[in-house]
A protein has these predicted regions:
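Short glycine/threonine-rich loop-to-helix capping motif typified by GTGT followed
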Residues: 1, 33-34
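Charged DNA-binding/catalytic regions of mobile-element recombinases
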Residues: 9, 43
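EAL-family c-di-GMP phosphodiesterase catalytic domain
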Residues: 17-31, 44-163
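Short, well-ordered amphipathic alpha-helices
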Residues: 1-8, 116
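Aromatic/hydrophobic pocket-lining residues that form π-stacking "cages" and hydrophobic walls in ligand
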Residues: 3, 37, 94
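Catalytic core of soluble alpha/beta enzymes
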Residues: 35-38, 42
């Protein structure tokens, strides 16, 4: 495959550090083909995340049939979870599904400290969004990683009790 050839041409790239995202809606067309392709990539050491989870029509089918290790909760649910009980229920349900299927879960669209706090209380430890960092050039990432500090309220959450 093309990916195998690229990895072979660049042995300095460890495929275990590569994660490809599959948009839930893009897998609708041919789940068998998508699954076969994902399995071929897994054989190379590449991992997968299901992106925008909850926005498609067959989310549970994807959890069962696609070999992903991570679910990314769509930002539309995360952003509204503090004001909308339905969005909160969806986020809570997706976190529960991830745990049931022994998958990692990451919340997209974490805009505020309160979003992060709520997610931690639900047992979701991974997040991305402007509340953590704005997009930045790759060259700025090392300095950001050295200087970033989680909010004290986030650090105060006992993750064993929250899960």
């Amino acid at each position: 495959t093309r990916l195998a050839a690229l990895l072979e041409a660049h042995p300095e790239v460890n495929p275990h550090y590569l994660e490809l995202e599959i948009l839930e809606t893009s897998a609708l067309n041919d789940i068998r083909k998508v699954s076969d392709t994902m399995n071929a990539c897994l054989d190379l050491g590449v991992r997968f995340a299901l992106d925008d989870f909850g926005t498609g029509y067959s989310s549970l089918t994807y959890l069962k049939r696609l070999p992903a290790h991570l679910i990314k909760i769509d930002q539309s649910f995360v952003r509204g979870m503090l004001e909308d009980a339905d969005d909160l229920s969806i986020v809570e349900g997706v976190v529960g599904l991830a745990k049931a299927f022994q998958l990692e879960v990451i919340a997209e669209g974490v805009e505020t400290i309160d979003h992060g706090l709520s997610l931690l209380q639900l047992g979701c430890e991974l997040a991305q969004g402007y509340g953590i960092a704005r997009p930045m050039p790759a060259g700025n990432l090392p300095e950001w990683a050295l200087n970033w500090k989680a909010d004290d309220d986030w650090l105060a959450i006992n993750l064993t009790e929250a899960s």
